[in-house]
Structure formats: structure tokens, C-alpha cells
From Swiss-Prot:
It is a peripheral membrane protein. The modification Phosphoserine is found at residues 34, 126, 447, 461, 474, 478. PROSITE patterns: AGC_KINASE_CTER (PS51285), PH_DOMAIN (PS50003), PROTEIN_KINASE_ATP (PS00107), PROTEIN_KINASE_DOM (PS50011), PROTEIN_KINASE_ST (PS00108). The keyword DNA repair does not apply. GO terms for biological process: cellular response to high light intensity; cellular response to hormone stimulus; cellular response to insulin stimulus; glucose metabolic process; glycogen biosynthetic process; insulin receptor signaling pathway; intracellular signal transduction; negative regulation of apoptotic process. Phosphorylation at Thr-309 (in the kinase domain) and Ser-474 (in the C-terminal regulatory region) is required for full activation. In adipocytes and hepatocytes, the activation is induced by insulin. AKT2 phosphorylation of PKP1 is induced by insulin. The active site is at 275 (proton acceptor). GO terms for molecular function: ATP binding; metal ion binding; molecular function activator activity; protein kinase activity; protein kinase C binding; protein serine kinase activity; protein serine/threonine kinase activity. This is RAC-beta serine/threonine-protein kinase.
């Protein structure tokens, strides 16, 4: 096994991803492709102090620019399973050339080594060394039974956004109902969401938990990716909370316990969810939680340049994400804190329409509670919403166990939770599987158009390229049932 060595090190000015200020960081570029940044210069290259930034330069792209400052360079690389861009500047053109040459050399040497370990790495705290192209090759496929769009009846539109739409469908052969997420390849590729989309598919395939949405099929057409998923028709918690304004502590405890159970399972498989928000917390027909991610932005389709600015809804971003620090499982406990605060207090813990002010609040403002909130609930929320992920409830090595052992959950039998033995505090009043009363009628009242306008349907020269991004994108859960 090759010993990892430091190829280049030194100070760089790194531009914040969310708060656009320049921060000095001491970076080490290593022979294994890791590119790690510290607030202070490490006393020894092998010191165990956790870095603030941790990227991989494998398969990276580099670009020189003189904006917004002279001697700037941009690295496009992989962090976790998302393609990201990070901007740096140095004091002279020569220094910039040295960094670019060193990074390119490491990237090239990794390419020559060829594929090593499994192409998808979900380990917490470190970026995946796999390249985007390798991820595409792994894509998704266990079954060869050909599933097509003709196998379904299309009943109602459930949601719509930047990348596509979600439709309630009925499988013709079985009469079963599913939610079909239809994503446009053109948009996924244009917005660098290929890695994220393939990751989502693999996570859905490999997870089996009562409070996580199961994937039944995944297939593609020449211009679409289609996920056929378990359908939960009890509506999302955003829908219910916006009508009821606040939940009782008992109701919030029930939902919180089911979310904790699902996060414990995901973390045990080295998956960090990263996107806990009310819109992603669905209820099934009995009132149990189903965590989903339809991958649709709430704002709908927009051509604005801000689309790519946020990975996740800004109000839910954890302080360590805003500060461009490397993050781990604790981001999910922050997300849990935000949604449970909303449930019990009827508002977000931090809110401002001005994003810069919002970020200041998330980073600096102390959490405040309404007088009506009980002491156990206050203690839980204060613990989950600690700014420092190491001090946060759930941020320690025992992860979910810390949260489960908090006195707010004292009455909860966790075995009963996962076995769905607890009685849901609210049972959706649905009369049939096609009853969509808990979905926004802004969508459900619309007629369904599977074929979008010509400018999206006619892909021309992009078509072949898109097939190379998503080879073997097919999956059927039936072989595992």
C-alpha cells in the first residue's frame, strides 16, 4: 500500500460558499487526493486535529480567473457525493501556477492508478475518492426486467419543481399506487446534480426502514430519469403544521422519535441525510412518518443564478455548513432541532428574508423559546441547536443514542417505535389511495402533461451525452422481496 505524503502545503484565501468573505486557511495537498484546510498551520502534517475543510481532487477540474480578485483559481471537485466548486486566491500568478500544477499532478496520478475500492463511499467526515464517472458506472442496477412509462396510469400531479415533477401513478399489472419522480436529464446535467442523483438512487435502493420511503423501480427514457417510490398520502408536516400552527409536545415527541429512529439507521449505514425539513417528512395513511426527498425546490422552476447557491433550504443550514467547515452526522441533529422547534413553537428558530442576516442569526444568535414550552422540550431543543457540532446533542461518538437517552424521550420505548407499536397522534382522513386532500391543490388541480414543452423534449446532440451519464439506470425491488 502506498504511503500518503504531503505534495504541497501553504496558506490560501478561501472564499465562503454562503457568506462570501475570504478566509485564510492552511491547506495540505496529499498524494491520496485529499485537500484539507486548517484555521492554523498544523504543527505536524500527520496531526490528528480535525480539518475545517476536506475535499478530494480526484477527477477535479481547475479554472483560472481574475475575478473577484486577481490570482484566483476555482476547483470543481467531489465532496461527499456532491460536485462542488470552491474558490481560492493567492498573492501572485507564480504561486497560483504552483498550486494548479501540484493539484493537476495529483489528480492525474490518481487517474493512472485506475479504480481501486468501491466507487461509492459514504464514510462520514471524508470526501469520496470516487470520480463522478465511476459513480455513473456503478449506477443502479440489479434487475433486468424492463420497466417503462407505459406500465403506469398517470393520475395526479403531487409536486413540481426545478428538476421535474412527482406524479401519483397506478401500476397497470398490479393496480398498486406509487409516487413517480420524473427528473429531466438535461437539467440534472446542467446543474451538476448527476452525482447527487445517482447517490439518491443508491441510498433508496439500499435502505430498508419503516420510516424511510422505499424505492420500487428506477428506469430511464432518452431524456428522463424515473424513480417509482412508495406513496405516502397523508401529506407532509409542512402542510399539517401550516394549518394547525403548532403541535402539542406529545405529537412532536411521536414524530421526533420516528425521525430519530430513521436517522439512527441511516447513520449506521454511513449515510448522512443532510436535508431534514418539514416538506420531506411525509405521513403514511396511518399517520407514521415517511422520510422522503422528492428533490424538488419549493420555489418551482426558475432560471435565476441563485438556484445553485444553496444545498438545502437556507433556514435549515447548520452553522458548520455555513462556515464552510467539514461536516458529519451532527448536521442531521441540527436539522432535527429545527423541525422539532417548528413543531412545538410554531415558527422557525432563525428567520430573516435577507439571507445574509439569516446566516448571521444561525451563526451568532442565541436560541429563544416561548414561555409555554416545557423544560424537557427546551433542554432537547437547546441541545440539538448547539452551534458547535461537537457540543451538539447527538454530536458525540454515540450519535443517536445521545438523543434517544434525553429526558424528553423518557417515555419512549424505542423498540416499540421501530415496530410501529405506538399509536399515531393523528390519522389522516383519507378515503382511498387516490385521495390527495393533504397535497397542495396548486399541484393536484393541474392536468398532467408527461411530455414537456419542445425545448425540453428535443435534446439534439445532448442525447448521446446524457446516456453516457446514466448507464444501466434500472432497478426493481421485486427481486429482494
Amino acid at each position: 500500500m502506498n504511503e500518503v505524503s504531503v505534495i504541497k502545503e501553504g496558506w490560501l484565501h478561501k472564499r465562503g460558499e454562503y457568506i462570501k468573505t475570504w478566509r485564510p486557511r492552511y491547506f495540505l495537498l496529499k498524494s491520496d487526493g485529499s485537500f484539507i484546510g486548517y484555521k492554523e498551520r498544523p504543527e505536524a502534517p500527520d496531526q490528528t486535529l480535525p480539518p475545517l475543510n476536506n475535499f478530494s481532487v480526484a477527477e477535479c477540474q481547475l479554472m483560472k480567473t481574475e475575478r473577484p480578485r486577481p490570482n484566483t483559481f476555482v476547483i470543481r471537485c467531489l465532496q461527499w457525493t456532491t460536485v462542488i466548486e470552491r474558490t481560492f486566491h493567492v498573492d501572485s500568478p507564480d504561486e497560483r501556477e504552483e498550486w494548479i500544477r501540484a493539484i493537476q499532478m495529483v489528480a492525474n496520478s490518481l487517474k493512472q492508478r485506475g479504480p481501486g475500492e468501491d466507487a461509492m463511499d459514504y464514510k462520514c467526515g471524508s470526501p469520496s475518492d470516487s470520480s463522478t464517472s465511476e459513480m455513473m458506472e456503478v449506477a443502479v442496477s440489479k434487475a433486468r426486467a424492463k420497466v417503462t412509462m407505459n406500465d403506469f396510469d398517470y393520475l395526479k400531479l403531487l409536486g413540481k419543481g426545478t428538476f421535474g415533477k412527482v406524479i401519483l401513478v397506478r401500476e397497470k399489472a398490479t393496480g398498486r399506487y406509487y409516487a413517480m419522480k420524473i427528473l429531466r436529464k438535461e437539467v440534472i446535467i446542467a446543474k451538476d446534480e448527476v452525482a447527487h442523483t445517482v447517490t439518491e438512487s443508491r441510498v433508496l435502493q439500499n435502505t430498508r426502514h419503516p420510516f424511510l420511503t422505499a424505492l420500487k423501480y428506477a428506469f430511464q427514457t432518452h431524456d428522463r430519469l424515473c424513480f417509482v417510490m412508495e406513496y405516502a398520502n397523508g401529506g407532509d408536516l409542512f402542510f399539517h403544521l401550516s394549518r394547525e400552527r403548532v403541535f402539542t409536545e406529545d405529537r412532536a415527541r411521536f414524530y421526533g422519535a420516528e425521525i430519530v429512529s430513521a436517522l439512527e439507521y441511516l447513520h449506521s449505514t454511513d449515510v448522512v441525510y443532510r436535508d431534514i425539513k418539514l416538506e420531506n417528512l411525509m405521513l403514511d395513511k396511518d399517520g407514521h412518518i415517511k422520510i422522503t426527498d422528492f428533490g424538488l425546490s419549493k420555489e418551482g422552476i426558475s432560471d435565476g443564478a441563485t438556484m445553485k447557491t444553496f444545498c438545502g433550504t437556507p433556514e435549515y443550514l447548520a452553522p458548520e455548513v455555513l462556515e464552510d467547515n467539514d461536516y458529519g452526522r451532527a448536521v442531521d441533529w441540527w436539522g432535527l432541532g429545527v423541525v422539532m422547534y417548528e413543531m412545538m413553537c410554531g415558527r422557525l428558530p432563525f428567520y430573516n428574508q435577507d439571507h445574509e442576516r439569516l446566516f448571521e442569526l444561525i451563526l451568532m444568535e442565541e436560541i429563544r423559546f416561548p414561555r409555554t414550552l416545557g423544560p424537557e422540550a427546551k433542554s432537547l431543543l437547546a441541545g440539538l441547536l448547539k452551534k458547535d457540532p461537537k457540543q451538539r446533542l447527538g454530536g458525540g461518538p454515540s450519535d443517536a443514542k445521545e438523543v434517544m437517552e434525553h429526558r424528553f424521550f423518557l417515555s419512549i420505548n424505542w423498540q416499540d417505535v421501530v415496530q410501529k407499536k405506538l399509536l399515531p397522534p393523528f390519522k389522516p382522513q383519507v378515503t382511498s389511495e387516490v385521495d390527495t386532500r393533504y397535497f397542495d391543490d396548486e399541484f393536484t388541480a393541474q392536468s398532467i402533461t408527461i411530455t414537456p414543452p419542445d425545448r425540453y423534449d428535443s435534446l439534439g446532440s445532448l442525447e448521446l451525452d446524457q446516456r453516457t451519464h446514466f448507464p444501466q439506470f434500472s432497478y426493481s425491488a421485486s427481486i429482494r422481496e
